[in-house]
Curated annotation (Swiss-Prot):
Classification of source organism: Bacteria, Pseudomonadati, Chlorobiota, Chlorobiia, Chlorobiales
Enzyme type, top EC level: transferase
Gene name of this polypeptide: hisC
Reaction catalysis annotation: L-histidinol phosphate + 2-oxoglutarate = 3-(imidazol-4-yl)-2-oxopropyl phosphate + L-glutamate
Quaternary structure (record): Homodimer.
Name by which UniProt lists this protein: Histidinol-phosphate aminotransferase
Stored PANTHER family: HISTIDINOL-PHOSPHATE AMINOTRANSFERASE (PTHR42885:SF2), HISTIDINOL-PHOSPHATE AMINOTRANSFERASE-RELATED (PTHR42885)
PROSITE patterns found in the cross-reference section: AA_TRANSFER_CLASS_2 (PS00599)
Annotated signal sequence range: none
Its EC number(s): 2.6.1.9
Taxonomic superkingdom: Bacteria
């Protein structure tokens, strides 16, 4: 008798669920995926497509996207062999974890943090060690260092600025953790362009156990293009490259990246707008009774309300999509929403005043 299909699958799947965006991805006002509210201008898209038309479509791209990697290495000021480009930072995350984790390994994850870290680790049969954030959702660097030593972990992942809390770990604290740890340290800087803290990319020459993860989906407004990067000491990067899927990045992605980097003022202007709106929104939210605001170092804001899921559903009915993050540890009754255009932000504020406002 043949075995049940479930017996033939990775046993880790039994405790995992497929990734899902609650509420979907379509709405009149969409603020649930931390995207940029600004698309690329038409003239820049036309430049990209004109260049792409000249590329051979019947031939595979390079095994690795060397053009894109050289361009990004020059942009961030590191050697080209210190950079790896991927089909989105999530694909890079899978590659790094494949290179570094597996049975018998231990990973330390502060919680709450990006859910994909734990998911990939479980798939690779890696033991997960959690370190809770402090009550105000700030990182506990001392606890991370202490727990990493006690548990003899092999890998530490730090999302800073952190999704879903919106808070950062000071760059000096990141370095202190990397210096103290007998482990590889991955620093996910998906939201670094919005942060008050410095990037730690410059530290890879000094800290040989440091890996920095970057995405082009947030500040660079290229979520639809799927472009991510890892940056590390070249010797470490050579090992990370071994499980990398070949031919995973298209020529179109490389060309788009190069054109956006050549017109980076568009990114700078967009980030400036988002930061200004973040401050304005934060000020307005503080005046709404029944809403508790958390400090943000990202392009999104976290609020705590009395009944988060009911509010999430009511906003959805009113064609406004936000994210219910109540399922994360320490985040009961919390909602997350990214900064949109001013009129989108005003529409959200109006609904929050109608639905939440209570006497202070």
């Amino acid at each position: 008798m043949k075995r049940d299909i479930q017996e033939l699958l990775n046993p880790a799947l039994r405790d995992l669920k497929a990734y899902n965006v609650e509420g979907g991805q379509q709405a009149g006002i969409k603020l649930n995926q931390n995207e940029s509210p600004f698309d690329l201008p038409l003239w820049l898209k036309e430049e990209v497509l004109e260049a792409f038309e000249k590329e051979p479509w019947n031939r595979y791209p390079d095994i690795l996207p060397f053009r894109g990697m050289r361009s990004y290495a020059s942009f961030v000021g590191v050697p080209a062999d210190a950079v790896m480009m991927s089909n989105g930072s999530n694909e890079m995350l899978y590659t790094i974890f494949l290179a570094c984790l597996g049975p018998g390994k231990k990973i330390l994850i502060p919680e709450p943090s990006f859910s994909l870290y734990e998911k990939i680790a479980r798939l690779l049969h890696t033991e997960v060690v959690f370190v809770p954030m402090l009550p105000g959702l700030a990182f506990d660097a001392d606890a991370i260092i202490r727990k990493a030593g006690e548990e003899r972990v092999d890998f530490i992942v730090l999302s800073t600025p952190n999704n879903p809390t919106g808070m950062s770990l000071a760059s000096e604290e990141v370095c202190r953790i990397a210096e103290a740890a007998d482990a590889l340290v991955l620093v996910d800087e998906a939201y670094i362009e919005f942060s008050r803290q410095k990037s730690v990319v410059a530290e890879i020459a000094r800290l040989k156990n440091l890996i920095v993860l970057r995405t082009m989906s947030k500040a660079l407004a290229l979520a639809g293009m799927r472009i991510g990067f890892a940056i590390a000491d070249p010797a470490l990067m050579a090992e990370i490259a071994k499980p990398k899927i070949p031919f995973a990045s298209s020529r179109l992605s490389e060309i788009t990246l190069q054109r956006v980097l050549a017109n980076y003022y568009l990114v700078t202007d967009a980030v400036s707008y988002i930061l200004h709106e973040r401050e304005r929104l934060s000020t307005e939210l503080k005046g709404i009774g029944g809403v508790e605001l958390y400090e943000s170092d990202t392009n999104f804001i976290i609020i705590r309300v009395r009944h988060a899921h009911e509010l999430f559903c009511e906003l959805s009915r009113r064609d406004i999509l936000v994210r219910d993050v109540s399922g994360y540890p320490l985040m009961e009754n919390c909602l997350r929403f990214n900064i949109g255009l001013r009129d989108e932000n005003d529409a959200l504020l109006q609904q929050l005043r109608l639905l939440c406002d209570e006497p202070v």
